[in-house]
Amino acid sequence: VTETSFGLTASALAMTSMLSSAGNPSARTFVYVSAATAGAIDTYSMDAKTGSLKRVSSFDAGKMVMPMTVSADKKHLYAVIRSQPYRVLTLAIDPATGKLSQEAVAALPDSMPYVSTGPSGRLLFTASYGGNKIAVLPIGRDGLVTDGIRQMILTGRNAHSIVSDRTGRYVFATNLGSDVVLQFVLNPETGMLEANDPPEIATKPGFGPRHIIVSPDNKSVYVLTELTGHVIHYALDTAKGTLSEVESVKSVPDDAGLFPGIAPPAPAAFNATAPVAVQADDGKPKVWAADIGITSNGQFLYTTERTTSRIALFQVAAGEGKLTYVTNYPTEQQPRGIRIDPSGRFLVASGEKSDRLSVYAIDQASGVLTPVGRYPVNAGANWIEIVTLP
């Protein structure tokens, strides 16, 4: 694995120059984009005033590098490789340039499409869609992940994401194929996940819960459903760590011409009860929702849908966190990932079938997105992380 500077074509350089500011070499906000096909993590500096990007370098991580997360102290980037041997890399973030360098590698038990950390910075949470499991790895005091899994839990079908609440006491994971959100309590003494009571909450059948986001005030949990494009809003009981459904709001308008998606069939040797019937694909265009994000002030929430390649905007009511769908925007083709910068002023979107990233300015009163620019990116762009250093 190596860190190299980009050699851009003349046209790409011209586009970058035109769409970005001159680029401040002392920029303190860095954008990281994993490009699964290329096996690279692209690094950009972001202009804090305009949101424009300057591509700095690319780290050769390995084929199928996909989910990433940043350490609590912002010194490390953890990147998961979904090609064999399955592994997670600990990468040092150069505070001056944003460039990455490998510090450690640890084995993973399966192909993991999701990774996150808790506020303590001592645990790495992963979820395996194909392996129907979640796994927890320890993070050393030096921020490195060097040991194997501390805990592995077999789940229902298609574990797709796993996140901690803002306190680190509770952890939630989605099972897309089983239509449930799992609820855990983190034992502070052992660092192990324990099933909460109840251990799960069901969505409506066929919804396919995918990605989870927790509101900044820790009162609400929002789950994007891949197969129907709903955002399910749950109230979080912070005394018990349990969820209760408040509402379910569509992110895909009826006139989009999409039909509900279909969950994959259960594997032959599965560790949980599988439905008897398997729905056949009728060839109609399907909802294929992907990612969800919320601004740091909790006022605006965004989701992506990959079949139509659009970003949806919701306004979030103060206090109770209820959602109002506002509109949607065209974006990069097959937008698997979005990320909002820590200031809440800019949104970055990637498309798995696009060779460009899009940056949007977020109107601070309405949440409306205005394009800032499009920037070259390696093939198979998916996951995005943004780091602002003090």
Put a short name on every predicted segment.
Residues 54-60, 101-106, 148-153, 196-202, ...:
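A short beta-strand motif characteristic of beta-propeller blades
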Residues 40-41, 85-88, 132-134, 179-181, ...:
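Structural signal for beta-propeller blades
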Residues 55-121:
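Blade-loop segments of beta-propeller domains
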Residues 24-48:
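An edge-strand/N-cap motif at the start of beta-rich repeat modules
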Residues 33-37, 71, 79-83, 118, ...:
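Conserved beta-strand positions in repeat-built beta-propeller and related beta-rich domains
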Residues 62-73, 108-123, 152-170, 203-220, ...:
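Beta-rich, blade/repeat-based domains predominating
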Residues 173-231:
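Loop-centered beta-sheet repeat module
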Residues 45-51, 91-98, 137-144, 184-193, ...:
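Short loop/turn segments immediately following beta-strands, especially the blade-tip
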